[in-house]
Amino acid sequence: MKPGELTPEGGAPKGYGVRLDLMARDAAKRFAERASHALLPEPSSVTSDYWDYARFRFAQRIASSCISVFATQQMLTAVGLGASRTLPAAAAVNWVLKDGLGRLGKLSVAANFGRAFDSDVKRFRFTSSVIYDASSFVEIITPYFPKHFLPLATAANIGKSVGITTANVVRAPIQRTFILEENLAEVAAKTSAQQVVADNIGLALAVGAARTMSKVASVRPEIRRALPVIAFGPLAVLDLVCIWKELKAVQLRTINKERAEIIAEMFVKEREIPTRARVADAERLFIPARLDKSNLPLTVTSLGEVCSTPKSLVNALKGSRNARPYILAYEPGTSKQRVVLDINTRDAPKRVATNITAKTRIKRKHKFPWQRKKTGLKGRALLALSESASSRDVLQAIIQVAHLRALPYRPDLTAEQAYVWALQESESLAKRDIDVFTKKLADRGWNAGRVLLNSAERAPYSVDNVPALIAALEAAVKNT
């Protein structure tokens, strides 16, 4: 039988089914290629961590879209059940007031946190999701309190405005991390396309669930109102888990205070700079930062807090004709107990074990020093930066704090002697390490040209004539 002839049974020509199968596969392949081109950037134009970020973001947007649909449904129900259910105009006024007052949240975020966003994009992004989900929950339970529609709806709308504004603001710094070919606009466009698809999937799922439950609600109306409340829990968990995974996948190249402390701690311990993936894994996405819970948390603050008395300021300025780039102090803890840190620090003085029992030693059960059980024994470190302080100076100060955490207890010294020795020893070690540290940072791909600090940490001091200031302070001390 020749090609194209009918089969003896009068069916389709031989090979017709094969051709249909090939056409279907070809069409599916073209569709997949077009979808990939529309939704995803070129693999060679983004970093490897982009794909985990995109995958978890897609799932998170689906969950978030479902939550939004259920929240809106409940808000409309609340308007219908409240005092305004017979007055459409009053319902409209309530809705407009809710939106208008909610914009105050957006204004508050833009006015008060502008500088802080750059220094902590991950923490702000995760916090924005927590606030958004909490606000959505307030909307979902509003039908159960119809007489309080306006205050509940306004509070929820303010929270959602804060969450949305924060998420939009920090999106660009995160997306900039992925680009390899100056293609930020492409990555932003593809991310928006992915968001539209995910939002529509979530919308379809939520509407389908609502329609299914509406049939059941014809028998028991209370079930329809309870569905969003029941669905909120798993959807919120999915939303937060996905955003957590999404942000953990992001490997920022910039250095802020927390990342600098993590890198410095690992460098002091291992003499190597950790990879960006390792630092991303060690970062915390919710307040407080990891090292804020260490045995010597670092606070970057004003000179007045670091040197609260004229005598302490004189001691800090002595030995230099020009203002120091930074001044570091620490407040010892109030406990009388002492702990020896079991860390091998090069050139550190020999540990003194006199009068120290085995119970007071910290066993190396954890990977990092700041993961040990908090003892509250060493107090806190205080750092003030001068207006001439460079990023190198900031990094040196943070390395000095890392060495401070690693220094052994000296029972042979008085409290004042131990204070002076600890600052001098840690400063010497930091000066020794800073060149190697900055070189290895660059080799690892970190952007060490600028250390990102928030507005509260940017309170630089300026001293024009150090000798004259010291003389005036010493005279003031004598007079008192």
Predicted features, each with a name:
Residues M1-A153, E186, G208-P234, V241-T480:
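Glycine-rich, hydrophobic membrane-spanning regions of integral membrane proteins that mediate transport
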Residues A59, A155-V162, V197:
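Hydrophobic alpha-helical transmembrane segments of multi-pass membrane proteins
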Residues C66, L104, S161-V169:
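Hydrophobic transmembrane alpha-helices of Major Facilitator Superfamily
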Residues I140, P173-T177, L240:
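Alpha-helical recognition domains of nuclear gene-regulatory proteins
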Residues I158-I164, L235-I243:
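Alpha-helical transmembrane segments and their membrane-interface exit regions
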Residues T165-I179:
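Intracellular juxtamembrane helix-capping segments at the cytosolic ends
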Residues Q175-K190:
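Short membrane-interface loop/juxtamembrane segments of multi-pass integral membrane proteins
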Residues A188-V207:
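Glycine-rich segments within core transmembrane alpha-helices of 12-TM secondary carriers
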